Curated annotation (Swiss-Prot):
Keyword DNA-binding: no
GO BP field: attachment of spindle microtubules to kinetochore; cell division; mitotic sister chromatid biorientation; positive regulation of attachment of spindle microtubules to kinetochore; positive regulation of microtubule polymerization; protein transport along microtubule to mitotic spindle pole body
Positions in coiled-coil regions: 3-39
Entry-linked InterPro entries: Hsk3 (IPR042332), Hsk3-like (IPR013183)
Originating organism: Eremothecium gossypii (strain ATCC 10895 / CBS 109.51 / FGSC 9923 / NRRL Y-1056)
UniProt protein name: DASH complex subunit HSK3
Amino acid sequence: MDQTKRRHYSQLSQQLQLLQKNLEATTQHVETMSVQCNEHLVNKLGKIQASWFIGGNRCFEQELLGKR
């Protein structure tokens, strides 16, 4: 193998190592984003459910007490 090929393989090896490092960082960021989105979604769904419950309860109270 001549010197030029060795140099190219060395550069390719360095680029592949950098690519692997960047892919690992990207994977960690995607996992963090996924956890945050899931937590946010569950939180939002909880608020929606609570709003429906409170609204339904108020309607029921108005009907029960005849306050329309």
